[in-house]
């Protein structure tokens, strides 16, 4: 499911990690994935692909330099929220992808009790580091992470009433 760009709702009665034919066909489309690891077994995941933003909670098992649908299992206890992106948001994503697709940044300083960000562009890791040190990230990466979070945050708050 992580590489999917479809707008279908997955079943809610089990952990989801399989791809439909339509989703497999969309795997080659340009995408950005932000994994926010809070130090427990679950991560918040934001994916922007073409005109669709997907937000959910899941488990990232083996992703390192690349990520694929087999590396992520969505936690069925939480809904997967999807939103169509507007034209300006789509353009922002396209520009960010073109700027970041050949980037590589890793902040090696470990910050305990802090959110770890990992950013993938077209399924390849381009950045990782901790939220407390985001000011040390290259400007384009900072902007992209903040933008993806700002688009997903209202969806989460609307869904959970937080």
Regions inferred by a protein language model and the residue ranges of each:
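Sec-dependent bacterial lipoprotein signal peptides
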Residues: 1-3
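Short, solvent-exposed loop/hinge segments that bridge or flank secondary-structure elements
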Residues: 40-50
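Hydrophobic/aromatic beta-strand elements that line small-molecule binding cavities or substrate pockets
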Residues: 44-46, 83, 117-119
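Short, internal acidic amphipathic alpha-helical interface segments
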Residues: 77-112
């Amino acid at each position: 499911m992580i590489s999917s760009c479809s707008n279908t709702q997955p079943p809610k009665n089990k952990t989801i990690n399989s791809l439909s034919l339509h989703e497999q066909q969309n795997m080659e489309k340009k995408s950005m994935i932000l994994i926010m690891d809070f130090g427990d077994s679950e991560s918040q995941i934001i994916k922007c692909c073409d005109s669709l933003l997907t937000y959910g909670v899941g488990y990232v098992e083996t992703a390192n330099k690349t990520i694929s649908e087999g590396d992520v299992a969505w936690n069925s206890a939480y809904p997967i929220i999807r939103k169509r992106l507007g034209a300006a948001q789509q353009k922002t994503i396209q520009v960010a992808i073109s700027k970041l697709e050949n980037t590589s940044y890793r902040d090696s300083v470990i910050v305990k009790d802090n959110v770890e960000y990992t950013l993938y562009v077209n399924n390849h890791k381009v950045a990782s580091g901790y939220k407390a040190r985001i000011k040390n990230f290259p400007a384009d990466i900072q902007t992209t992470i903040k933008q993806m979070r700002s688009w997903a945050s209202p969806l989460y708050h609307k869904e959970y009433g937080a």
